[in-house]
């Protein structure tokens, strides 16, 4: 058995019905679309969500929410990533230089994920309550 000799079992794959190829095929002339009407035309049919002229559901329901533009330029940093750094002071520029966060990030927040044993000084970064406790327990400090 080789890759070039593999083929499906006999009768496993059935050829698709060819529409509009004569009355003998069973799907000739109108091609299974019926006579006249919007759906029989090429390019016919209604758009998704169309309810026959009734006010559609997506317009009946109120709008809600928004996309925060600040969230697009905010990165999250995990505690174990701080432990990998060779520096004792951490700020946003160091995180960008070490490629822990994308260069276009303007803000960063440290979250509690993993552990940290080395004392580090955090400058100008957001820190969650759990991460703050872990950093201070390791002997580090947070400068706003």
From Swiss-Prot:
It comes from Hamiltonella defensa subsp. Acyrthosiphon pisum (strain 5AT). Residues 1-53 are annotated as: Disordered. Keywords: Ribonucleoprotein, Ribosomal protein, RNA-binding, rRNA-binding. This is Large ribosomal subunit protein uL15. InterPro entries: Ribosomal_uL15, Ribosomal_uL15/eL18, Ribosomal_uL15/eL18_sf, Ribosomal_uL15_bac-type, Ribosomal_uL15_CS. PROSITE patterns: RIBOSOMAL_L15. The keyword Cytoplasm does not apply. Binds to the 23S rRNA. One of its GO terms (biological process) is translation. Belongs to the universal ribosomal protein uL15 family. Residues 21-31 have a biased composition (Gly residues).
């Amino acid at each position: 058995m080789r890759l070039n000799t593999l083929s499906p079992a006999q009768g496993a794959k059935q050829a698709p019905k060819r529409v509009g190829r004569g009355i003998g095929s069973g799907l000739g002339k109108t091609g299974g679309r019926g006579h006249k009407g919007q759906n029989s035309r090429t390019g016919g049919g209604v758009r998704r969500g169309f309810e026959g002229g009734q006010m559609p559901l997506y317009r009946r329901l109120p709008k809600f929410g928004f996309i925060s533009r600040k969230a697009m330029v905010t990165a999250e940093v995990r505690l174990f990533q701080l432990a990998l750094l060779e520096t004792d002071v951490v700020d946003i520029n160091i995180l960008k230089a070490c490629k822990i966060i994308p260069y276009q990030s303007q803000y960063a927040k440290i979250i509690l994920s993993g552990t940290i044993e080395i004392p580090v000084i955090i400058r100008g970064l957001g820190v969650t309550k759990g991460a703050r406790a872990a950093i201070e327990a390791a002997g580090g400090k947070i400068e706003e």
